[in-house]
Regions:
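Domain-level signal for Mg2+-assisted phosphodiester chemistry and nucleotide/NA-binding surfaces
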Residues: 1-107, 154
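Nuclease catalytic cores that cleave nucleic-acid phosphodiester bonds
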Residues: 86-197
Length: 197
């Protein structure tokens, strides 16, 4: 008889996940050639766990572009969000990116703060047995330390196999789920149209 899966939450740092996916794609293939399914990605992570878990909530944090400046990219972002919302476990917390006219690029503003708050409040909420942060961004070390050491839900990490990261707590027994190319195949579909990465 198998044990009943315990409730977990997945906190996704979207652009870090998209940036890191290239570490499991064939060399030279950009991240905008695959479309990630957040629900299936959570299920892949749950299957890798050393105990039965289920993700009751999946929160995707992302910055979005200016719809007036880049309407096609904005439409692509909104279509992606609508697809993810087909899974009732998924919620998206988006914040407007700041456009830098000197570099013609966007910069995320407030997304990292929202992720850190989500990690810490979810860990302490009493609603989950565990919270998994899918990111390799070392800027989250202070929030990770707080959430990992606080009483309440266990905290774990997820990232792509081979994705460079300094997001770690030396000397601690912090569990990390490493997703490889086979895992990517289970939680993505090829994307033949213009992407956002």
């Amino acid at each position: 008889m198998s044990a009943t899966p315990v409730p977990f939450k997945l906190v996704v740092d979207l652009y870090n996940v998209l940036d890191g996916v290239t570490s499991v794609l064939p060399w030279g293939r950009p991240s905008n050639t695959v479309e990630l399914d957040m629900g299936r990605m959570a299920d892949v992570i749950a299957a890798k766990s050393n105990r039965p878990i289920r993700f009751d909530e999946i929160t995707v944090h992302m910055g979005v572009c200016d719809p007036r400046r880049h309407p096609q990219r904005y439409a692509t972002e909104q279509a992606m969000i609508r697809r993810w919302h087909r899974d009732p476990r998924v919620s998206v917390r988006s914040r407007p990116n700041r456009f830098n006219p000197e570099t013609s690029t966007y910069e995320e503003k407030g997304v990292d703060t929202a992720i850190a708050l989500d990690l810490c409040t979810s860990q302490a909420s009493g609603r989950f047995d565990g919270v998994v942060l899918f990111s390799a961004d070392a800027d989250f070390v202070p929030a990770l330390e707080q959430a990992y050491r606080a009483p309440g839900a266990t905290v774990q990490l997820a990232r792509w196999k081979g994705q460079p990261s300094r997001l770690w707590l030396p000397g601690e027994k912090l569990w990390c789920h490493y997703l490889d190319e086979d895992d990517l195949a289970q939680c993505s579909t090829p994307c033949t149209r213009w992407g956002i990465a």
